[in-house]
Regions:
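Helix-loop boundary and gating motifs at the non-cytosolic
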Residues: 1-51, 196-230
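Helix-to-loop junctions at the C-terminal end of transmembrane segments
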Residues: 52-67, 241-254
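Intracellular juxtamembrane helix-capping segments at the cytosolic ends
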Residues: 107-120, 295-310
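C-terminal ends and interior cores of transmembrane alpha-helices
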Residues: 75-90, 263-277
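C-terminal transmembrane helical hairpin of 12-TM major facilitator-type secondary transporters
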Residues: 255-299
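Juxtamembrane intracellular "pre-TM" segments in multi-pass secondary transporters
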Residues: 1, 175-204, 377-394
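A late C-terminal transmembrane helix in Major Facilitator Superfamily
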Residues: 311-340
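Symmetry-related core transmembrane helices of the 12-TM Major Facilitator Superfamily/SLC fold
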Residues: 155-175, 345-364
Length: 394
């Protein structure tokens, strides 16, 4: 646990901060710069900064990872506070602040997840990833509920304090644990993308990210005032099933868990496409979406890219796996102006169709949990059952 504690603090602090900072920053942009063109431009600058930061960070951070992660967390706290400078009269200043904000997210996220992967063994990575994401999910939920009574300036200051707190804890824990040695191999992006196993997992993940964020504004339109409550319940379900998904990923393999997640998503959107006017379909959607997100968070987001990296440095794998999800967050901004022209049932039907189609590459994808580890677990379970049977009749 001593080895793993710094990774938990780092990932928990970073992902909670990222989720709430992005949401709060988006609210500030929408309130301050309501003009459609400028609004889309500023959102785009922020997400562009994330992409630029992630690509740059994957090259730079492995050289002195722990030190750079500390600098990154300090940068995050400063930029969080500086976001209050955004206003409708100085768009150039807004652009500078937002590209800095995007880079303050992107620079260290791949290294944070790579750090997590390097502190876990492949046979336990899913379980640890699930437990970590459960903590993240409940952390976001608790923090978000606490922030509801705060105005935007106070929210930004609270997030800055949260970031500094994580920095101090990570600094102390890394000094207690000692330096973590990095894998020596540094693969190129081209070599990674030419790998068949990476492509077969990356394509469905891209498809999921596009569908998820494209459908998000449509779901808000359908659920109306119930959206906030549904989001809270879904976060709680995700928090529970992240741990379940992680444990299952270590027991039966990552591939089966991921395929199950896509099947669940396909079913929930099919239900909405047929019965979105019935409240019961909302309950089904909330339950299924929470389960699917739990499975994906622990396995697809936290575990899979570390598995695929094997003995290589893992930052670039997490960049390729993380960017589709991070950049797809820009899609709701583009979709909102066209909500009135979108037929809800058609949108949900298309989403369901492509989510089922996304399973096809996964069928041909290799299992990333070594077969030997699965056999060892099965043999261990068989021996334990045999002992219990023997004790029962002796």
């Amino acid at each position: 646990m001593k080895e793993f504690a710094p990774a938990v603090v780092l990932v928990l602090n970073s992902l909670v901060w990222f989720a709430l900072f992005t949401q709060t920053l988006g609210t500030l942009i929408d309130r301050t710069v309501p003009m459609p063109t400028e609004n889309v431009l500023l959102h785009g600058i922020y997400y562009g900064g994330i992409a630029l930061g992630a690509i740059l960070g994957a090259f730079v951070f492995p050289r002195r990872r722990e030190n750079y992660l500390l600098y990154w967390m300090l940068m995050g706290s400063i930029v969080t506070t500086a976001s209050l400078l955004i206003n409708s009269e100085q768009l150039y200043l807004d652009a500078i602040v937002l590209i800095a904000a995007g880079m303050s997210v992107g620079l260290g996220l791949p290294s944070s997840l790579a750090y997590f992967a390097d502190t876990t063994a492949v046979e336990n990575r899913g379980t640890y990833g699930g437990i970590t994401w459960s903590t993240v999910g409940f952390g976001i939920l608790a923090f978000a509920l606490a922030l509801t009574s705060m105005d935007l300036p106070t929210t930004f200051l609270a997030l800055a304090v949260w970031r500094v707190t994580g920095l101090l804890l990570f600094f102390i824990l890394t000094r207690l644990r000692g330096k973590l040695e990095l894998p020596p191999s540094k693969p190129r992006y081209g070599a990674i993308l030419r790998r068949r196993d990476v492509t077969l997992y990356l394509l469905p993940w891209i498809m999921f990210s596009l569908i998820n964020f494209t459908e998000a504004p449509i779901l808000v339109k359908v659920f109306g005032e119930s959206q906030e409550l549904i989001g809270v319940v879904e976060f709680a379900i995700t928090g529970i099933f992240a741990t379940v998904g992680g444990i299952m990923g270590d027991l039966v393999g990552r591939k089966r868990v991921v395929i199950a997640g896509f099947m669940i998503l396909g079913i929930e959107y099919a239900v909405l496409s047929l019965f979105s006017s019935f409240t019961a379909s909302w309950y089904i959607y909330t339950l299924f979406d929470g389960i699917a997100w739990g499975l994906f968070a622990s396995v697809f987001f936290m575990t899979l890219w570390g598995d695929l990296a094997e003995t290589n440095q893992k930052e670039k794998f997490y960049v390729l796996g993380g960017l589709p999800y991070l950049l797809a967050g820009f899609l709701p901004v583009l979709v909102k102006p066209f909500l009135g022209k979108i037929e809800t049932a058609t949108a949900f039907s298309i989403a369901s169709f492509f989510l089922f189609i996304a399973v096809l590459p996964l069928i041909y994808a290799p299992e990333t949990l070594p077969e030997k580890k699965i056999k060892e677990r099965e043999l261990r379970d068989y021996v334990e059952k045999a002992k219990k049977t023997k004790d029962k009749y002796v």
